[in-house]
UniProtKB/Swiss-Prot annotation:
Involved in the biosynthesis of the chorismate, which leads to the biosynthesis of aromatic amino acids. Catalyzes the reversible NADPH linked reduction of 3-dehydroshikimate (DHSA) to yield shikimate (SA). Belongs to the shikimate dehydrogenase family. Homodimer. Its EC number is 1.1.1.25. This is Shikimate dehydrogenase (NADP(+)). Transmembrane segments: none annotated. Pfam families: SDH_C, Shikimate_DH, Shikimate_dh_N. It comes from the Archaea.
Length: 266
C-alpha cells in the first residue's frame, strides 16, 4: 500500500483526505491518505520523518508552506513563489512543488477563460495571492496586486513583474480588468462581506474567489448579478489536488470523481 498525506496545523478541517481517497478508489489504487499535525516549528523534522517512514508524497498546508520550501529541493515555480504545497518522495531526495499555481490555471481553463493577454487584478498577497499572481503572470496576463499591507503588494508585484495598487484604487483598477482573483479570508467567517464593492464589478470580468467555505460568497453573488463569469474556490482546491495526484502517480486525475467527493462535503 502506498501512503500519502497532509501536514499542517490544524488539519482537521481539510478536505484533502476525501478528495484523494476518491481518486484512489476511482483508479483502483492500493493507497491511503493520512494527516499529520506537527508543532508549528517542526515542519522540517516532520518532512524528514515522513520520508523515513516510506510516505510516497505529502501535501503541505498552513503554516508550513514557506518552511517546506526551505526543507526540500524545489522546482523553479515553487522557488519563485517561495512556497511548497506538494512533496514527492519518489526520487533520490524529496522534491517540492506548488500545485496551487496549476490549480488557478486549470480552474480558469475549465471555465474557458483565457489568461493570455488578460488584465488581471489579485486581491491579497499572502500564500494564495502569491500562487495566483504567479499563475496569471506565467500564463501571460498583466497583473495588478491590491493588498491591505502595501509593502506586501509592492513585493509581490515586483516578483511577478506587475503593479501594486491600493485597496482604495480597486474600482478604477477593475474598470478595464478581465480577470479578478480574490485571495484573502474576507467572506469566510462573515458570508455577507466582500472585498470588492458590487458596483465595481462588470460583465467583462471572470472572478475567482479562493474562499470555498462558503462556496457561494458575497463576492461571487455580486459578480453573477453583474453578469461576470464566476469561479468558486472549490475549483482551485480540486485542481491543485488533481495536479498533486498526477505528480505522485503518473496517472490522469479522475477529476469528476474528485469533484463529486469534494462537493458532497461543501
Amino acid at each position: 500500500m502506498d501512503v500519502y498525506g497532509l501536514i499542517g496545523n490544524p488539519v482537521g478541517h481539510s478536505l484533502s483526505p476525501p478528495l484523494h481517497a476518491a481518486a484512489y478508489d476511482e483508479c483502483g489504487l492500493d493507497a491511503r491518505y493520512v494527516t499529520f499535525e506537527p508543532a508549528p516549528d517542526d515542519a522540517a523534522a516532520a518532512i524528514r520523518g515522513a520520508g523515513a517512514l516510506g510516505v510516497a508524497g505529502l501535501n503541505v498546508t498552513a503554516p508550513f508552506k514557506q518552511s517546506a520550501a526551505s526543507a526540500v529541493a524545489t522546482d523553479s515555480m515553487a522557488a519563485r513563489v517561495g512556497a511548497v504545497n506538494t512533496i514527492d518522495f519518489s526520487g533520490a531526495a524529496p522534491r517540492g512543488y506548488n500545485t496551487d499555481v496549476a490549480g488557478v490555471k486549470r480552474a480558469f481553463a475549465h471555465h474557458d477563460v483565457s489568461l493570455s493577454g488578460a488584465q488581471a487584478v489579485v486581491v491579497g498577497a499572502g500564500g494564495a495571492g502569491r500562487a495566483a499572481a504567479f499563475a496569471l503572470a506565467d500564463a501571460g496576463a498583466t497583473v495588478r496586486i491590491a493588498n491591505r499591507t502595501r509593502a506586501a503588494a509592492d513585493e509581490l508585484a515586483a516578483d511577478v513583474g506587475g503593479t501594486a495598487v491600493g485597496l482604495g484604487d480597486l474600482p478604477r483598477s477593475l474598470a478595464d480588468a478581465t480577470v479578478l482573483v480574490h485571495a484573502t479570508t474576507v467572506g469566510m467567517d462573515d458570508p455577507d462581506t466582500s472585498p470588492v464593492s458590487a458596483d465595481a464589478l462588470h460583465d467583462d470580468l471572470a472572478v475567482l474567489d479562493a474562499v470555498y467555505s462558503p462556496v457561494e460568497t458575497r463576492l461571487l453573488r455580486d459578480a453573477a448579478a453583474a453578469g461576470a463569469t464566476t469561479i468558486d474556490g472549490a475549483w482551485m482546491l480540486l485542481y491543485q489536488g488533481a495536479e498533486a495526484f498526477e505528480r505522485w502517480t503518473g496517472l490522469d486525475a479522475p477529476v469528476a470523481a474528485m469533484r463529486a467527493a469534494l462537493r458532497a462535503r461543501l
